[in-house]
Amino acid sequence: VTESNPFRLDKRLLRVAFERAASDYDKVALLQREVGRRLLERLELVRVTPALILDAGAGTGHGSTALARRYKEARVLALDIAHAMLVQARRHRAWFRKQRFVCGDIESLPLANRSVDMVFSNLSLQWCGDLDRVFEEFQRVL
């Protein structure tokens, strides 16, 4: 929450909170893992062969690793606002997987236009202050 807009999240404070939580996050992220598992199940219905997948709000990387397993030929880009979350994500990846890690904001993706083939996001959008901007960014990079 910011002073100028009580409904807008302060990204600096959000980043700090996730930086602090990163080392113990997996111990309590049961809902996130269950929702992620269900999202991945739904991908069975999607017939697509992506070359590059963006995991937007990747957290500790469980979704990124599962995407790399499912789409063996694809590169997976794990993006999170908190560097410490990405440090944890690196620990989950398999050494032979084509995973990359980028610290960035979903509302201002540090990616080129039309650079990804799929966007995956698990319980991250509630941390965004401007959903219209988020979906504009997703559309831009797809």
PLM region descriptions:
Residues 52-109, 133:
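Class I SAM-dependent methyltransferase SAM/SAH-binding core
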Residues 107-118:
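A short acidic, Gly/Pro-enriched loop at the edge of an enzyme's catalytic core
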Residues 117-132:
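A short SAM/SAH-binding and catalytic strip from SAM-dependent methyltransferases
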Residues 132-142:
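A short glycine-rich, Lys/Arg-flanked "PGG" loop and its adjoining helix->strand segment in the class I
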